């Protein structure tokens, strides 16, 4: 008897037909299927009115990046619903793994009692080398990760339920191991990143001498990171 498929929900926090929307979903799907070819992957866009999935039917719930500014006091219903959903799923009896990417990390941090702020560097675009904490080094079996970045908002307070796996809250994990988040974009490559870059100015794409970032066509660890994500989220390797 075959084992059940690896069940994944992608919560898209952007309009799917906006620039880069469907290519981003396609890239996440591709990265998952490199490790789990038979994965059952469904996309839910609360921003377009979709109902968020029953967590008991999922092994992994992925919150994508998105354009809505979570520092705003007034939040649309879909954002409020997403934050409440995160509180419910992390407190409930079913424990699917939850992955947050960029906006997804920020939403998870807010839902779990953390706080956000703006980067004093402005919009950060490029590829960064992220030093890991001892816990992060053990989890990823590496002292650092190289990852795409494209954000201005960041987590300033991780709250009571999250632990840092990298310096500057770049990677977080919940104390119970259910939640893993990245401020960067492990799903991005240079083609996808270029869709979200508004200018060819080399500073904006990581080539500026003072940026500390590499250009978006530099090598990165996206595939390695996603392989580790899938292994972490898979029921048969949930403790590895």
From Swiss-Prot:
A molecular-function term among this protein's GO annotations: hydrolase activity
Any one Gene Ontology cellular component term annotated for this protein: nucleus
Top-level lineage group: Eukaryota
Protein's pathway: Pigment biosynthesis
Keyword Hydrolase: yes
Residues of the Glutamine amidotransferase type-1 domain: 13-205
Keyword annotations of the record: Glutamine amidotransferase, Hydrolase
Active site: 102 (nucleophile), 185, 187
Pfam families per the UniProt record, alphabetical: GATase (PF00117)
EC number: 3.-.-.-
Task of the protein: Glutamine amidotransferase-like protein; part of the gene cluster that mediates the biosynthesis of the yellow pigment chrysogine. Pyruvic acid and anthranilic acid are likely substrates for the nonribosomal peptide synthetase chry1/NRPS14, with pyruvic acid adenylated by the first A domain and anthranilic acid by the second. If pyruvic acid and anthranilic acid are merged and released from chry1/NRPS14 by hydrolysis, a subsequent amidation would lead to 2-pyruvoylaminobenzamide. This process is probably catalyzed by the amidotransferase chry2 using glutamine as amino donor.
PANTHER family cross-referenced by the UniProt entry: GLUTAMINE AMIDOTRANSFERASE YLR126C-RELATED
Family, per entry: Belongs to the peptidase C26 family.
Protein name: Glutamine amidotransferase-like protein chry6
Originating organism: Gibberella zeae (strain ATCC MYA-4620 / CBS 123657 / FGSC 9075 / NRRL 31084 / PH-1)
Lineage: Eukaryota, Fungi, Dikarya, Ascomycota, Pezizomycotina
Gene name linked to the record: chry6
